[in-house]
């Protein structure tokens, strides 16, 4: 990643901070001198600390970068064209939070598999009413369980994120030099060839808005994004609703036939088609334009095989025990 890309990332973080004010309590420290002398044994850190007083804002480096030919821009334009085509193909789903899509896929995946296996197993007992009653009982309890699991998982992610932010804020107030070291380590991990002047210039630019130093470390050092508002509730409803919706599919055919064997056949036919298209569409949503037709077909077949094995095993063992 180039320094231009890194500065673009900082601009994004600035816009985010202005919009959300997520760590605005650090704003009052904007004039605090963050680049101080280092007592570290690391020669790299010593060089950065000693050169910080000589480098104002890396004007020469910035001018060189601005005057250099920007081949990245052309690549970005090509990437934008590909992105536009992908957006046109995905339609509505492109505007939905990827985490919501992920939760929906989790709910649908389990909902299409578990209730199908259960209803297939219960059908071996020969009682359609038992299949419907047992299927609905499992469907409701499963949706609640999946929803609670999604809620707790999202809550744990949110708690971890805010704990990391709090820790970095405390580190900033206790010893802001540690923040500079972390930013330096992140930059060197991105590109070990960054010069001392480039790193110091970047830190000096970033220190103008101190709360962004915390945001930068959290996002690029910890790999964490701020959870969306009401993330826990959205995750619970999406996963639980997806499970409920998916679980209704194998159950519906039993409402329209009197013979449980016929209902099982119809349910299998419906589920083969549904599982295949679910695997196909899931791959298209998750991989976008990077997924080939053969890959999507393969994923669809795999979903059919997994669902079929689960349903077949349930039917066999219930029949064996019955």
UniProtKB/Swiss-Prot annotation:
<keyword id="KW-0813">Transport</keyword>
<comment type="similarity">
    <text>Belongs to the CCC1 family.</text>
</comment>
<feature type="topological domain" description="Vacuolar">
    <location>
        <position position="322"/>
    </location>
</feature>
<feature type="transmembrane region" description="Helical">
    <location>
        <begin position="237"/>
        <end position="257"/>
    </location>
</feature>
<feature type="modified residue" description="Phosphoserine">
    <location>
        <position position="53"/>
    </location>
</feature>
<dbReference type="GO" id="GO:0006828">
    <property type="term" value="P:manganese ion transport"/>
</dbReference>
<dbReference type="GO" id="GO:0030026">
    <property type="term" value="P:intracellular manganese ion homeostasis"/>
</dbReference>
<protein>
    <recommendedName>
        <fullName>Protein CCC1</fullName>
    </recommendedName>
</protein>
<dbReference type="GO" id="GO:0006826">
    <property type="term" value="P:iron ion transport"/>
</dbReference>
<feature type="topological domain" description="Vacuolar">
    <location>
        <begin position="121"/>
        <end position="129"/>
    </location>
</feature>
<feature type="modified residue" description="Phosphoserine">
    <location>
        <position position="29"/>
    </location>
</feature>
<feature type="topological domain" description="Cytoplasmic">
    <location>
        <begin position="151"/>
        <end position="236"/>
    </location>
</feature>
<feature type="topological domain" description="Vacuolar">
    <location>
        <begin position="258"/>
        <end position="259"/>
    </location>
</feature>
<keyword id="KW-1133">Transmembrane helix</keyword>
<feature type="compositionally biased region" description="Low complexity">
    <location>
        <begin position="26"/>
        <end position="53"/>
    </location>
</feature>
<dbReference type="Pfam" id="PF01988">
    <property type="entry name" value="VIT1"/>
</dbReference>
<keyword id="KW-0472">Membrane</keyword>
<feature type="compositionally biased region" description="Polar residues">
    <location>
        <begin position="60"/>
        <end position="70"/>
    </location>
</feature>
<feature type="transmembrane region" description="Helical">
    <location>
        <begin position="301"/>
        <end position="321"/>
    </location>
</feature>
<comment type="function">
    <text>Has a role in both calcium and manganese homeostasis. Involved in the transfer of iron and Mn(2+) from the cytosol to the vacuole for storage of these metals.</text>
</comment>
<dbReference type="GO" id="GO:0006879">
    <property type="term" value="P:intracellular iron ion homeostasis"/>
</dbReference>
<dbReference type="GO" id="GO:0005384">
    <property type="term" value="F:manganese ion transmembrane transporter activity"/>
</dbReference>
<feature type="topological domain" description="Cytoplasmic">
    <location>
        <begin position="1"/>
        <end position="99"/>
    </location>
</feature>
<keyword id="KW-0597">Phosphoprotein</keyword>
<feature type="modified residue" description="Phosphoserine">
    <location>
        <position position="71"/>
    </location>
</feature>
<feature type="region of interest" description="Disordered">
    <location>
        <begin position="19"/>
        <end position="86"/>
    </location>
</feature>
<feature type="topological domain" description="Cytoplasmic">
    <location>
        <begin position="281"/>
        <end position="300"/>
    </location>
</feature>
<dbReference type="GO" id="GO:0005381">
    <property type="term" value="F:iron ion transmembrane transporter activity"/>
</dbReference>
<dbReference type="GO" id="GO:0015093">
    <property type="term" value="F:ferrous iron transmembrane transporter activity"/>
</dbReference>
<keyword id="KW-0812">Transmembrane</keyword>
<keyword id="KW-0333">Golgi apparatus</keyword>
<dbReference type="GO" id="GO:0005794">
    <property type="term" value="C:Golgi apparatus"/>
</dbReference>
<dbReference type="GO" id="GO:0000324">
    <property type="term" value="C:fungal-type vacuole"/>
</dbReference>
<keyword id="KW-0926">Vacuole</keyword>
<dbReference type="GO" id="GO:0000139">
    <property type="term" value="C:Golgi membrane"/>
</dbReference>
<feature type="transmembrane region" description="Helical">
    <location>
        <begin position="100"/>
        <end position="120"/>
    </location>
</feature>
<feature type="modified residue" description="Phosphoserine">
    <location>
        <position position="83"/>
    </location>
</feature>
<feature type="modified residue" description="Phosphoserine">
    <location>
        <position position="68"/>
    </location>
</feature>
<dbReference type="GO" id="GO:0000329">
    <property type="term" value="C:fungal-type vacuole membrane"/>
</dbReference>
<dbReference type="InterPro" id="IPR008217">
    <property type="entry name" value="Ccc1_fam"/>
</dbReference>
<dbReference type="GO" id="GO:1990461">
    <property type="term" value="P:detoxification of iron ion"/>
</dbReference>
<feature type="transmembrane region" description="Helical">
    <location>
        <begin position="130"/>
        <end position="150"/>
    </location>
</feature>
């Amino acid at each position: 990643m180039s320094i231009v890309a890194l500065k673009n990332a900082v601009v994004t973080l600035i816009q985010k901070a202005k919009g959300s004010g997520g760590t605005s309590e650090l704003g009052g420290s904007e004039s605090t001198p963050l680049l101080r002398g280092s007592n570290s044994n690391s020669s790299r850190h010593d060089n950065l600390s000693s050169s910080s007083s000589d480098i104002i804002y890396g004007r020469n480096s910035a001018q060189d970068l601005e005057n250099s030919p920007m081949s990245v821009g052309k690549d970005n334009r090509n990437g934008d064209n590909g992105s536009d085509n992908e957006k046109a193909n995905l339609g509505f789903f492109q505007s939905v939070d990827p985490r919501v899509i992920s939760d929906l896929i989790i709910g649908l995946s389990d909902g299409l598999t578990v209730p199908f296996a259960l209803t297939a197993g219960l059908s071996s007992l020969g009682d359609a009413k038992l299949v419907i009653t047992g299927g609905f009982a499992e469907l409701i309890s499963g949706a609640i369980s999946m929803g609670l699991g999604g809620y707790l998982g999202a809550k744990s992610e949110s708690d971890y994120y805010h704990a990391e932010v709090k820790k970095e804020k405390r580190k900033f107030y206790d010893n802001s030099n540690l923040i500079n070291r972390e930013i330096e380590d992140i930059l060197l991990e991105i590109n070990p060839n960054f010069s001392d002047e480039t790193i110091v210039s970047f830190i000096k630019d970033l220190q103008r808005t101190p709360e962004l130093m915390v945001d930068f470390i959290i996002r690029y050092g910890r790999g964490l994004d701020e959870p969306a508002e009401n993330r826990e509730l959205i995750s619970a409803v999406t996963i639980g609703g997806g499970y409920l919706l998916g679980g209704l599919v194998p159950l519906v055919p039993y409402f329209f036939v009197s013979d449980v064997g016929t209902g099982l056949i119809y349910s299998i036919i419906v589920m083969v088609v549904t599982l295949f298209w679910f695997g196909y569409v899931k791959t298209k949503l998750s991989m976008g334009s990077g997924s080939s037709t053969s890959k999507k077909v393969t994923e669809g077949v795999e979903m059919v095989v997994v669902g079929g094995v689960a349903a077949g095993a349930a039917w066999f063992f219930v029949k064996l025990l019955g």
